[in-house]
C-alpha cells in the first residue's frame, strides 16, 4: 500500500516558542510539506495546528517538532461508571466502534467512539471499515504516534507509524466531506490532513475545545466511553516530535452494536 509523502499534523494552542511550529527560523530550516495539524515535523507527515500556529491549518507533517515532556499518569480502567467529560453529541450516533489500547505493552483499557454517519457518511464509513479491518488493512496494531497534553492524541498511520503514511478505503486520499460539525470539546474525533481534501486514515481525539480547527478538519464522531483512558494517553511522557516514550498501541479494534 502506498503511503503519504507528507506528514499530517494538528496545530495546538500553545505559544509558537513552546511548540516550535510557527517559528519562522524552524520553518525555514525545515522547509518541507506540512500536512494539516502542524507541530513541527520530520521528513513529512500529518500534524495538527496549535492556536499559536492559528494561521496554518492542521496538516500532514513536514515542519519542526517541539520537544515536550509530559508526566505519565497511572493507567485507569475506562469503566462506564467512571466516565467523565462526555459531552452532548452534536449529531445522531449511527455507528459505534472501539479501540482496545495497551501502553508500554500492558493493557490499558478501551475507548468507545460514536460516529455521525448522517452528517458525514463517507468519512464515517472510512473510519468504521478501518476499525473492522474488512478491507484487509486498518487500525489494528497501529499506534498513537503523536501526543500533546492539553490538545490531542493523534493516530491512524498504519503504513509508516510516524505520521507520514496511512491510506483511506477510497484510495490514498479523499475530499473534505463538510465542516458542519465542530471541535466543541474533549473527546471530539476528527480527521488529520495535509491541507484541503487530503484525508486518509490519520485521525485525532481532542482533549480540549479546539475551535481554531473548525472548517479545516472534518469532525465525524466523539468518544462516548473511555475518556479516562484518553486522559491517560494524553499524559504520557514524550520525547522529540511529541512521540510517546512508551508505545501506545491499538491491539484490537472493531464495531459494536448500537445498543451495546
Swiss-Prot record:
GO cellular component: chloroplast stroma
Gene induction: Strongly induced by light.
Keywords: Chaperone, Chloroplast, Disulfide bond, Isomerase, Plastid, Rotamase, Transit peptide
Gene Ontology BP, a term: protein folding
Cystine connections: 131-248, 206-253
Expression sites (tissue/organ): Ubiquitous, mostly expressed in leaves and flowers.
GO MF term set: peptidyl-prolyl cis-trans isomerase activity
Subcellular location: Plastid, Chloroplast stroma
InterPro entries per the UniProt record, alphabetical: Cyclophilin-like_dom_sf, Cyclophilin-type_PPIase_CS, Cyclophilin-type_PPIase_dom
Domain annotation PPIase cyclophilin-type: ranges: 98-255
Predominant localisation class: plastid
Catalytic activity, EC: 5.2.1.8
Assembly description: Interacts with SAT1 and A.tumefaciens VirD2.
PANTHER family noted in UniProt: PEPTIDYL-PROLYL CIS-TRANS ISOMERASE, PEPTIDYL-PROLYL CIS-TRANS ISOMERASE CYP20-3, CHLOROPLASTIC
Protein name: Peptidyl-prolyl cis-trans isomerase CYP20-3, chloroplastic
Amino acid at each position: 500500500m502506498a503511503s503519504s509523502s507528507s506528514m499530517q499534523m494538528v496545530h495546538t494552542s500553545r505559544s509558537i516558542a513552546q511548540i516550535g511550529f510557527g517559528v519562522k527560523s524552524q520553518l525555514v530550516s525545515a522547509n518541507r510539506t506540512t500536512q494539516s495539524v502542524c507541530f513541527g515535523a520530520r521528513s513529512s507527515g500529518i500534524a495538527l495546528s496549535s492556536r499559536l500556529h492559528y494561521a496554518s491549518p492542521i496538516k500532514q507533517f513536514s515542519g519542526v517538532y517541539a520537544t515536550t515532556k509530559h508526566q505519565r499518569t497511572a493507567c485507569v480502567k475506562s469503566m462506564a461508571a467512571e466516565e467523565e467529560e462526555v459531552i452532548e453529541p452534536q449529531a445522531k450516533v449511527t455507528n459505534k466502534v472501539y479501540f482496545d489500547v495497551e501502553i508500554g505493552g500492558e493493557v490499558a483499557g478501551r475507548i468507545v467512539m460514536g460516529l455521525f454517519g448522517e452528517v458525514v457518511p463517507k468519512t464515517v464509513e472510512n473510519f468504521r471499515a478501518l476499525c473492522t479491518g474488512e478491507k484487509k488493512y486498518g487500525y489494528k496494531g497501529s499506534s498513537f504516534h503523536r501526543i500533546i497534553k492539553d490538545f490531542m492524541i493523534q493516530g491512524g498511520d498504519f503504513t509508516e507509524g510516524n505520521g507520514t503514511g496511512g491510506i483511506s478505503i477510497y484510495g490514498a486520499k479523499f475530499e473534505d466531506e463538510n465542516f458542519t460539525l465542530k471541535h466543541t470539546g474533549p473527546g471530539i474525533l476528527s480527521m488529520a490532513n495535509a491541507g484541503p481534501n487530503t484525508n486518509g486514515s490519520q485521525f485525532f481525539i481532542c482533549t480540549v475545545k479546539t475551535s481554531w480547527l473548525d472548517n479545516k478538519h472534518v469532525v465525524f464522531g466523539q468518544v462516548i466511553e473511555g475518556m479516562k483512558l484518553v486522559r491517560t494517553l494524553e499524559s504520557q511522557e514524550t520525547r522529540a516530535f511529541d512521540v510517546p516514550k512508551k508505545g501506545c498501541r491499538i491491539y484490537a479494534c472493531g464495531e459494536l452494536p448500537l445498543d451495546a
